[in-house]
């Protein structure tokens, strides 16, 4: 299996998995044009689309792709039923695509119906988990997003986290504002800064590394707890997550 990223809009990535025969899976095609160009250039045969949630920058290209390739099966959560989804999937179910079984994981927070797809080592997490950050809470609660991130963080160490946006540099600037002396965060920030200066992608990331540099996955970390305690005493990790998310919203 080959993993490919297709840039779209200002900072989106549309992920494509293809096998040796050229069959491919497309994840969150917000725009059809760059996908159609990649399909033509690589001689791919699209078999399926995965949708993580209903936002337009993730679903906008579905109808055009299905019109061009009517055999495509479109998997998505209930909230994408009017966006072109032909196979609604929910937490605990599986999608069998390209000979691989993908587990569906409910991750409410960014939207209430947001889902992720996992088939070792690939995690397609939409706008739930970003490198160094997490999605804004447009519909869900901090507690829901905390639980969603906890699920994803429990996946195997070698999981390849395929996020839908290039937000890594701004996320790491925020992380540095919270933990300015953290060695892992500083090292990763320098690496990301160099990559982005060359206009290079920072994704996918390995989950084991992400747990070290993503403050939203470190709500039980003593260094982070000490920083938060300087401002307010919060006993529960969900409360610390909410504090972080509120800070990031204003950053």
Curated annotation (Swiss-Prot):
Pathway named in the protein's UniProt entry: Secondary metabolite metabolism; methylglyoxal degradation; (R)-lactate from methylglyoxal: step 2/2
Cofactor annotation comment: Binds 2 Zn(2+) ions per subunit.
InterPro entries on file: Clx_II_MBL, Glyoxalase_II_hydrolase, HAGH_C, Hydroxyacylglutathione_Hdrlase, Metallo-B-lactamas, RibonucZ/Hydroxyglut_hydro
CDD domains in UniProt: hydroxyacylglutathione_hydrolase_MBL-fold
Keyword tags: Hydrolase, Metal-binding, Zinc
GO MF terms held by the record: hydroxyacylglutathione hydrolase activity; metal ion binding
Cofactor dependence: Zn(2+)
Class of the enzyme per the UniProt entry, highest EC level: hydrolase
Family matches, as SMART domains: Lactamase_B (SM00849)
Positions that bind Zn(2+) 2: 57-58, 127, 165
Subunit record text: Monomer.
Family: Belongs to the metallo-beta-lactamase superfamily. Glyoxalase II family.
NCBIfam families: GSH_gloB, PRK10241.1
Biological role stated in the UniProt entry: Thiolesterase that catalyzes the hydrolysis of S-D-lactoyl-glutathione to form glutathione and D-lactic acid.
Name this protein carries in UniProt: Hydroxyacylglutathione hydrolase
Organism whose genome encodes this protein: Escherichia fergusonii (strain ATCC 35469 / DSM 13698 / CCUG 18766 / IAM 14443 / JCM 21226 / LMG 7866 / NBRC 102419 / NCTC 12128 / CDC 0568-73)
